[in-house]
């Protein structure tokens, strides 16, 4: 969970860590997704500026880690490198919708548990 957000998203997109050609674009898209996550109730407002920001700086729950990471990857993939196939595009969108629902439910449960305490 201590891995770099930018580096891990680059790896999932098939971009080597050493290649910095797309870093500015990826950082912009990643930060846009963090705004969406915050609006869904996941995490505090958060942005990255380079490869030094790590996942555990954004999310402290190991339980939600992979869901958040998958969500950020899929959203960035659609923004940065959308698939040519409409069938693949619809599959990505369906996965994103499901992850949004699950993240929102988890955030609401966490919020109601905190309020009840």
What are these regions (language model features)?
Residues 1-64, 101-117:
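Conserved short "hinge" loops at termini or chain/domain junctions
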Residues 3, 62, 68-70, 86, ...:
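Helix-centric, low-specificity signal for extended rod-like, repetitive segments
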Residues 53-81:
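Mid-chain, well-packed structural core segment of small domains
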Residues 28, 32-35, 74, 78, ...:
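Short, residue-level hotspots on alpha-helical faces of the histone-fold
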Residues 78, 82-117:
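Protruding loop/beta-arch "assembly-hinge" segments enriched in small, turn-prone residues
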Residues 7, 66, 72-74, 90, ...:
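Short alpha-helical segments used as structural interaction elements across diverse proteins
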């Amino acid at each position: 969970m201590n891995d770099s957000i930018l580096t891990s998203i680059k790896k999932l997109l098939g971009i080597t860590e050493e290649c910095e050609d797309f870093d500015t674009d990826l950082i912009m898209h990643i930060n846009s997704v963090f705004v969406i996550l915050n609006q869904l109730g996941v995490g505090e407002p958060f942005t990255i500026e380079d490869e030094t920001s790590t996942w555990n700086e954004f999310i402290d729950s190991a339980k939600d880690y992979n869901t958040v990471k998958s969500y950020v990857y899929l959203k960035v993939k659609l923004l940065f490198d959308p698939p040519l196939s409409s069938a693949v595009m619809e599959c990505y969108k369906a996965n994103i919708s499901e992850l949004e629902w699950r993240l929102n439910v988890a955030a609401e449960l966490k919020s109601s548990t905190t309020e009840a305490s």
